[in-house]
Amino acid sequence: MAMDARWQIIAYLIASVLFRLASERLDPFIKVHISRHPAWMNFGSPFLRFVYHIGFPYLALLLGALPARYLGLVGLEQLYGAPELSTVSGMVERMRITIALLLRSWLPQLGPWASLTILMAGLLTATWTLYRYARRSTGGNPPFSSMPGSAGDVTAFSTMVYAAVHWSFYRGGIWWLSDDLYLGVAGGAALIFVEWGLCAWLAGRPLQQLTSERTLIEAGLLIATAAIFYYVPNLWLLIPVHWLLARLCRYLMPAPLDLADMDI
């Protein structure tokens, strides 16, 4: 791998983290002045979320800094120059062939993907069931907090797509740098945890945010999806699993409104 390619990926990862930190830092200022600029809630804030979660991964992919397979976009690279696509002209027919080629490339992964999905769902169910009983028996309530820049319901599909794509971007970037999938998965998770910690520190309440049930659910989803990505590095299949696991966690942990404001 050329050194300049390594530095490109490093630059994208650092820029993404700095963008998130800058957004967190600016959030209190924005909230104070939100009444003067109501259009911010309808355009500005969603635009920043899109740039952070989707913009950086897409730019790295578009400019060739990060190959598609490292993002988990299995089958995408095979579409370029595919003879089946070069012989058809109709848009509908090209779309049908494209979907067929993608599905064909996923077939070997469907078995492990289904097994890991069931396993992770079982582990999360057991973990959160035990947690609920432990909390009920102690009579205590862990701290809740609302994270600046919250992004809607935890079960919202758009929120899950954002998280799945961006987490895969961090995993894929470090996978590309290290040329080791295990290091990519572990390093990507570590980078996300560091980013969360820095955001909590900038907010001035690190312990409260990092021990909230919202953050615990985020961490559980991160670990579960990282394990699935290690064995089945396919973002197409990971996105619906991410959403289903998030709905499962939300069902198992009915809690105050901080869970309805998760930004993952």
Language-model features: where?
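Membrane-interface interhelical connector segments
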Residues: 82-99, 134-151, 176
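Cytoplasmic membrane-interface regions of multi-pass membrane proteins
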Residues: 21-43, 130-149, 202-212
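Alpha-helical transmembrane segments in multi-pass membrane proteins
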Residues: 1-125, 215
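Transmembrane alpha-helical segments in integral membrane proteins
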Residues: 19-24, 117-140, 169-176
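Transmembrane helix-loop-helix hairpins at the membrane interface
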Residues: 13, 17, 129, 142-264
